[in-house]
């Protein structure tokens, strides 16, 4: 999508005369050293301040600084009073509030709603340094400190709560966060462009209440914007115009007298002069058009209307054709403008070339910040994801259009890391983004790109308009390897294997030069039921990628392994589906550690399915498919235990589940059994203590699994990143089995009320190759959540 470069093209604010700050100030003392008497803009964030382009406050702060503004940072303030929010004084223009790179609720709670004791974005990995629903709390404190100062909220937390949304932690539908926070403007997505425009207009003296038409923003209004045409979508199966359709030629003087037609004299008067007239272009169906969504009060009570509203929102994410949205909340409503135009390559380069120090603020001393340690030698080469995985919110935050940096800018950053990162060893830990292999990929049809409303460019099959040539990525990898002093370039971002197999040359380049012993990919499941609700491909694509991976590893003389990621308890998953996945894992001797139950994050399509138990991936009707959803704690524990079938802590609940499914034949001591029978001492105090602890998680996978493939079941340790032990991935791997799970008298899904009905026939190994999107998790630290 061709976008004009406007981000840095406007005249700078007068305060540019103060120059560039070594670090954006966090105290009055730092401000005084810079010669500042005040800040123009103050950013309040739930993360520690790290001056690095993977941290949102740094990107936004440096971008605004480049526009000439004096920007201060209040990081992880004490929210118990307004005092910490006054430490930099009153900002001249506005407060910018963000929860940080992660949603504060996901940051503070596990998928089982248990509070976390750690926080990777806090010095010392200490938990509890940010409040629940940080955007709301911080905004209220800013308003308390300086009532008349505008507050603009943004980042991943605000972005994914821009309309009424299901909240997993309170198990109810909540209002748009702009109402709870009482903010003046909400910005969604990567907000450089809308934030620069709003700052410029505020600096010019425009009132915050008058700035309501900026793309990529949401505001509170009593009614829709004037002169916008409305589409009423408050009911299912009903869509009609709210206002009369305007004359497409712009004429406003067509009355009844003019509709009778011209006289015969005018028709046959061929000698009469005919002036040439130029008609205005016919407006597009989405130009100045909004969709009226069901009200908050309605979607809170009616799950069909909630699914319907969610479906509309996800179809209005293409900047080229998106319509505005208006959702009533009582006597007011939230007006969501169309998404901001994506940054072009020049603008992306300019943002990432800003003068970042690439280290934490000196105020933290020598304290470790785990999130920084993880990404300090990684490089973000792009934004966006067109995969559309239903459990992921990156598409709703960053968009489907891939925004790529130039190769020159990326190589410059590699050299910057060499100069600025203390203790750099010559290894770049990642060249990636939400997905590793979408760099400079996109739609080959400009018209299709501007008008498409598909949820995914690769599901259920790869779109014919999508370019799949990885030439630019291959060229980038080679150029990066050629930088003097660089020993290794690793690819740690998730690889879209269904996309990669379209270009075997890319797979070869990746496998032979950029895999540090094992490569992480995410099939997420093996069964069609959950895969169809995840919008993920069948295992045929995984098998084909694995075949290429093994082939190219062998050609390079390397022993390398694929590390598959899986999700348990995802909407659409039955107990039988999880059993078949467990059997697939056991057959291949995979032993997973640190497995993840499905986590319903706000605005994700899968979260809508979780809440409504309806298939919102298709048009919502009163006859929409009802989806099985593992919600009960016991059933979710069973699904998680099946992923770790090898852990004695889960054997009791697995046995109960197998009996409920009529699969007692899988309980025994032979290699063909899933779990052993209950032992004599199993319920003793010592065993229960050990079982509750589970097996120690060395990596995402058990340390001895690779040695077991050689028959060394007692071997210890994890595979080395540079030279893992064990055979080549997939050596002598048996074909997917097809276990029988249907037998007379089999019981209902485990964890539901009562045991009745029949178990479904197993489907392991029956999935066909498909094409589906792979997006990183919404909580990913790589995400540019500003």
From Swiss-Prot:
State the SMART domains in the record.
Elp3
The note describing how and how many cofactors are bound reads: Binds 1 [4Fe-4S] cluster. The cluster is coordinated with 3 cysteines and an exchangeable S-adenosyl-L-methionine.
Residues of the Radical SAM core domain: 371-649
Report the leader peptide range: none
Keywords attached to this Swiss-Prot or TrEMBL record, sorted alphabetically, are: 4Fe-4S, Iron, Iron-sulfur, Metal-binding, S-adenosyl-L-methionine
Compositionally biased spans, kind Polar residues: 732-741
Molecular function as annotated in GO: 4 iron, 4 sulfur cluster binding; catalytic activity; iron ion binding
**Superkingdom of the organism of origin:** Bacteria
Bias (Low complexity) ranges: 718-731
Where [4Fe-4S] cluster is bound, by residue? 385, 389, 392
Query: What ranges does the record list as Basic and acidic residues composition bias?
Result: 679-688, 706-717
Task: Give the protein's cofactors.
Answer: [4Fe-4S] cluster
Region Disordered, residue ranges: 669-688, 698-786
Keyword Metal-binding among UniProt keywords: yes
Tell me the protein family, please.
Belongs to the UPF0313 family.
- Protein name according to UniProt: UPF0313 protein SO_0311
Species for this entry: Shewanella oneidensis (strain ATCC 700550 / JCM 31522 / CIP 106686 / LMG 19005 / NCIMB 14063 / MR-1)
Q: Lineage in the entry?
A: Bacteria, Pseudomonadati, Pseudomonadota, Gammaproteobacteria, Alteromonadales
């Amino acid at each position: 999508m061709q976008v004009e470069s406007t981000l840095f093209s406007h005249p700078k604010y007068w305060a540019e005369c103060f120059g560039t700050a070594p670090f954006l100030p966090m105290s009055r003392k730092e401000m005084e050293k810079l010669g500042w008497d005040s800040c123009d803009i103050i950013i309040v964030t739930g993360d520690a301040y790290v001056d690095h382009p993977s941290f949102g406050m740094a990107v936004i702060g440096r971008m605004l600084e480049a526009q000439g503004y004096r920007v201060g940072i209040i990081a992880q303030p004490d929210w118990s009073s307004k005092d910490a929010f006054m430490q930099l004084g009153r900002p001249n223009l506005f407060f910018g509030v963000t929860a940080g790179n992660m949603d504060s609720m996901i940051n503070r709670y596990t998928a089982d709603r248990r509070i976390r004791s750690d926080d990777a974005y806090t010095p010392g990995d200490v938990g509890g340094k940010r409040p629940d629903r940080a955007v709301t709390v911080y905004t209220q404190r800013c308003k308390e400190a300086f009532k008349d100062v505008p507050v603009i909220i943004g980042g991943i937390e605000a972005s994914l709560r821009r309309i009424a949304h299901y909240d997993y932690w309170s198990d109810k539908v909540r209002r748009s966060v702009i109402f709870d926070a009482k903010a003046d403007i909400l910005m969604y997505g990567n907000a450089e462009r809308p934030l620069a425009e709003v700052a410029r207009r505020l600096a010019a003296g425009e009132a915050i209440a008058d700035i309501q038409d900026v793309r990529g923003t949401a505001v509170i209004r009593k009614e829709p914007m004037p002169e916008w045409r409305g589409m009423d979508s408050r009911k299912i199966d009903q869509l009609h115009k709210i206002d009369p359709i305007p004359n497409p030629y712009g004429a406003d003087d067509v009355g009844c007298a003019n509709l009778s037609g011209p006289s015969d004299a005018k028709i046959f008067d061929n000698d009469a002069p005919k002036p040439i007239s130029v008609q205005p272009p016919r407006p597009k169906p989405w130009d100045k058009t909004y969709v009226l969504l069901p009200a908050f009060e309605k979607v809170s009570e009616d799950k069909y209307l909630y699914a319907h509203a969610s479906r509309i929102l996800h179809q209005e994410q293409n900047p080229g054709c998106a319509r505005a949205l208006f959702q009533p909340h009582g006597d007011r409503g939230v007006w969501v403008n169309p998404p901001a135009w994506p940054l072009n390559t020049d603008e992306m380069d300019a943002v990432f070339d800003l003068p970042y120090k690439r280290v934490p603020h000196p105020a933290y001393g020598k304290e470790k910040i785990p999130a920084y340690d993880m990404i300090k030698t990684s490089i973000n080469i792009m934004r966006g994801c067109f995969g559309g995985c239903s459990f992921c919110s990156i598409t709703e935050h960053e968009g489907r259009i891939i925004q790529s940096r130039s190769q020159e800018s990326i190589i410059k950053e590699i050299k910057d890391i060499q100069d600025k990162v203390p203790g750099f060893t010559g290894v770049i830990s990642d060249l990636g983004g939400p997905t590793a292999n979408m760099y400079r990929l996109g739609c080959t049809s400009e018209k299709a790109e501007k008008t498409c409303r598909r949820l995914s460019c690769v599901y259920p099959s790869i779109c014919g308009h999508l370019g799949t040539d990885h030439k630019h990525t291959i060229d980038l990898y080679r150029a990066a390897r050629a930088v003097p002093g660089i020993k290794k370039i690793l690819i740690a971002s998730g690889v879209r294997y269904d996309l990669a197999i379209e270009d075997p040359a890319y797979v070869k380049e990746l496998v032979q030069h950029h895999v540090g012993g094992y490569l992480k990919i995410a099939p997420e499941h093996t069964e069609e039921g959950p895969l169809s609700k995840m919008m993920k491909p069948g295992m045929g694509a995984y098998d084909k990628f694995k075949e290429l991976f093994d082939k190219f590893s062998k050609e390079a003389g390397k022993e390398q392994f694929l590390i598959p990621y899986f999700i348990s308890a995802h909407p659409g998953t039955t107990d039988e589906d999880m059993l078949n996945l467990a059997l697939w894992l056991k057959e291949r001797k995979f032993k997973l550690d640190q497995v993840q139950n499905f986590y319903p994050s706000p605005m994700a399509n899968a979260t809508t399915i979780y809440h409504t138990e309806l298939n919102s991936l298709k048009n919502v009707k009163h006859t929409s498919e009802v989806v099985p959803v593992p919600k009960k704690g016991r059933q979710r524990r069973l699904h998680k235990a099946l992923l770790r079938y090898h852990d004695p802590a889960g054997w009791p609940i697995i046995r109960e589940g197998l009996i409920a499914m009529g699969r007692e034949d899988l309980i025994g001591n032979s290699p063909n059994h899933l779990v052993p029978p209950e032992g004599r001492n199993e319920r003793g105090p010592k065993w229960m203590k050990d079982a509750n602890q589970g097996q120690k998680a060395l990596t995402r996978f058990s340390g001895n699994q690779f040695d077991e493939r050689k028959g060394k079941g007692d071997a210890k340790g994890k595979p080395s990143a540079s030279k893992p032990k064990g055979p080549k991935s997939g050596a002598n791997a048996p074909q997917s089995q097809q276990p029988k799970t249907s037998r007379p008298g089999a019981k209902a899904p485990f964890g539901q009320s009562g045991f009745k009905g029949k178990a479904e026939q197993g489907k392991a190994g029956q999935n066909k190759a498909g094409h589906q999107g792979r997006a990183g998790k919404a909580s990913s630290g790589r995400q540019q959540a500003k």
